[in-house]
């Protein structure tokens, strides 16, 4: 019996894809990256996943664990150059979640999305560790834990837990199921998985444990504005714990996580300035003197605002009008359309994206007037969101600060708050849309930059020999914890990997330390000149 037949025996024929065209969207990253796989497998239960992993291990197959495939740094798709065959194991059919201890914690499974968890917690007036950003793309809870994702919500920090159920292969090449959920589910893998799936325990009497189910020291780290280290970055040793930060080196079947009380009242302060130092002054004052940490503090540059307004309009409309619940199905429909039209010579590559872009031009401007007014006046924008007593703290401080500073601010209403936040998050797809409209005639270089907490001069100034190779620079990110997304749209003929080398060489000359990510992101402890 060959490998594919063994997999079909476990999960059924409809849950194994071997056709290259049909499997492409699971072998290709959201922003970049693509590799080969013998098959893409979709186990529908934890027991099926356990059996699939055993089949793959017995056949000496490289296992690529995948959830929603919303990773921006190629981590959930195969890469070229493997020494043996690979199989993608996609867990999105295992959608269950279990609220435990009256919703104060949750057990999430491979297909549990942040959107699903948000909806389940909303009647309890509670929230997951992350409720903005990647949740708009249908991201999975376990995918976030695997990569310590998140951190945009300043009070909660990156996704983290010390309580999980996972599979790993030891130094003797033996596979093990490890139950560190803090719940007695039996001894054998079959007992543990069956009891978990069937909820054979009291969900509201799960015993407390000394192990953490969320990032427990983030406030201390994020408030230290004099540290010469980054606040958060991939593979931070302090955030690596079994499944947390494992980046697919173990297979997570379940994680136990804290949930958080929903804020009763929030307020966004929309700040504009032509001097980025003013935003850093605000950050430092808030982090060192405010009693209440902000909910979030999202940054956008003028060029990012402009390009997202044009190339992200259709995404903004979908999210604002339809919501995020149907996004996975819409992505699947788009992928099917691309695959179908690829075989018809009349249609050019990326036709669905070109059609969506054309249709978006028929809709009126979606951005509120005050946000557009700030775009005309200022180059840098900060969306500062406060909650509870922090609202008045920010109100008093910003009024005093901008009596003397060159920029300005306003208190956003509900529509402005929603549009600003969604506009900021659709920016992540702008470079891809631009490239697709150019039919791959240009390249893009997306980077994630983790600056030192004490880096006052955080805004980038590239040397001319690099600047001349870039058509557009899209700067956006999480200002309060100094993590920046910098997407470069390159001029025709410029090679992204060669330019990346030049960028690294430049950054090495001005930084204390550089840590390249395993894929595309670059994480820097930096003092810019």
Residue ranges: model-predicted function:
Residues 80-94, 99-141:
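Anion-binding (especially nucleotide phosphate/pyrophosphate-binding) glycine-rich loop
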Residues 1-54, 58, 71-105, 257, ...:
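N-terminal flexible segment immediately upstream of the FAD-binding catalytic core
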Residues 264-296, 303, 310-357, 369-401:
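A conserved active-site cap/scaffold subdomain adjacent to cofactor or substrate pockets
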Residues 122-277:
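FAD-binding subdomain of flavoenzyme oxidoreductases
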Residues 139-146, 298-314, 420-425, 489, ...:
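Short, conserved secondary-structure transition motifs
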Residues 31-32, 36-38, 61, 73-83, ...:
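Conserved glycine-rich FAD pyrophosphate-binding loop
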Residues 16-20, 42-43, 63-67, 74, ...:
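General beta-strand structural signal in soluble alpha/beta enzymes
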